[in-house]
């Protein structure tokens, strides 16, 4: 029965399991996400978290469903009008996935912050939508000190805005788009060198010759190249072309002197650039090794930094300046026997390296009085197979972004080289928040107010720019446009933002892929987006 349940789950979540694996799905299923405000944006975010199977969610919203809510929110109906918005949205969202547990709190976030701020610290991630500036700042401060990730999302007319607030977010499985293969042909380890030496391309049967893996072919001709060039690896375009010609000359000839059709040699020629990548430690990994948290290990140090320190010690000792072997090779034309033998050489070396890193982990844990099992073998293997792709994202706090002395002026001013850059939309959002603080409403919320609010909003924008010492010009067109928006939350923009925001939440929960740092702006007018470190 348990086996059947597992099979059904694999079928249900097949696509996403291929993306983040069983361990990523487990993290998702044990997560508890808090959504503040069941707005169109908020429910779209939750929809995209409920469908892939987050463990549970709680909606906090003290508002009642209005006619406007029923009109722009897919998860609220006319029959919901007058009910609590959190409760109504929860009921519809739970219908999407029976594996997910939902709950609601019929209270405003402001009241909870006044009476029980620690309430927000029980969640894996908090997602806040359509909050006023003052509430966002208070919430961000509470969660920052408790190291709970916060994602602020907002749909304002044709503008989408997201801000991630998280002190530190280490990522082991960053899944880079164009990861280079780890073949070590420039620095073959002894077992690999011995495997290459077992091949004699000059005295092979035709069948064996045409089914030799291209990695072996390149290694054999690289040895010949070294003997002719005093051990210098091909680097320039001309040298690589000469090296390709050298491989091409090794293709067998038929009785008429014409080259045979040997696809494995063609594959080798095609993969010269891939094979000749130098084995080195990326600068981003060097930065992690030199980080204070990697150098100063204590009992409170998170497992990521203990693993990073163990990796650093491996590089200095057993690795002889290199990271652990990844242990994977690409598919290629070869007979099964030869491919598996080559694959096993890399795999066995990867296991040996992982064991060496594991020994360093055990010593570090012992030195700080932690139990050896506090870091699992699964975590260790993940680190070693992804050691070249580790990332640490550190966001600035919202208080720093809003501080007169700590605002990132350089990022804003440099982006304003283009007067239509998406950063303008950020400045306008700050201006409408100032307008809201002064007027108790957003500009243009009623048709008759649009014209009279243009001057007021322009004044708010000017005041904001002057107060923060931002010597930039914003076109009047943007002021007019934001007044016409009337703080509306169009479902099309909310749906787009909901998908993008849910993706970031999943990255945070699974600790896979890399979150943006720290602000994302989407323009529905130009259908473009940009990220900024504010």
From Swiss-Prot:
The modification N-acetylalanine is found at residue 2. One of its GO terms (molecular function) is ubiquitin protein ligase binding. One of its GO terms (biological process) is protein neddylation. SUPFAM superfamilies: Activating enzymes of the ubiquitin-like proteins. It comes from the Eukaryota. The record marks 211 as: Interaction with UBA3. Keywords: Acetylation, Apoptosis, Cell cycle, Cell membrane, Disease variant, Intellectual disability, Membrane, Ubl conjugation, Ubl conjugation pathway. Pathway: Protein modification; protein neddylation. It is linked to Neurodevelopmental disorder with dysmorphic facies and ischiopubic hypoplasia: An autosomal recessive disorder characterized by moderate to severe global developmental delay, facial dysmorphism, and ischiopubic synchondrosis hypoplasia. Affected individuals show infection-triggered lymphopenia, and loss of developmental milestones associated with epileptic spasms. Diminished white matter volume, enlarged ventricles, and thin corpus callosum are visible on brain imaging. Belongs to the ubiquitin-activating E1 family. ULA1 subfamily. Heterodimer of UBA3 and NAE1. The complex binds NEDD8 and UBE2M. Binds APP and TP53BP2. This is NEDD8-activating enzyme E1 regulatory subunit.
